[in-house]
């Protein structure tokens, strides 16, 4: 005989005999371009596409137009998801060199972590990427790691190395140039730096899109 599962009154029963039951996947880094660029994608269309592919939860990034760096901006995204998303969802607030008080409003402090419903953590771009969010100076990173609660998720690339190597690559237009410019050493340097900050300040850390074996081995 099978297990002891039984339906409660009013619950829908799906006959799945002979089928596979698979867990929904979680995508911890999506870039639904809402607000600012809905012609590319918005929360509704992105979540429907996710669900069609078996992704039942997503965490969205803050490098929108404009960037989501305040609680007010975050609440607008959360409200849109409440109306339009068809999956579970969460949102990262973007860090800047001078918005620690906004981050605290969203996720609290080390002594009093108080994440706002719908906000899953702080996104720190240690290297420049799409959008205008960039925090790479040590004093600003220290301030964020020392004075905020919750989880910090990093785009871990070393900005100084990117700038040093840019003259070598700025005339390249081939697809390989991107990976060669943003090389393994660039990623490792930032991952090591973020890890040291997290350890020094006892802060939870998630390194997004870790891309190299040397980072994993380190």
Predicted segments, located by residue:
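Histidine/acidic residue-rich metal-binding segments in metalloenzymes
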Residues: 101-218
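Short beta->alpha linker loops
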Residues: 69, 95-97, 210-214
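Short, surface-exposed connector motifs at secondary-structure boundaries
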Residues: 55-59, 84-89, 197-205
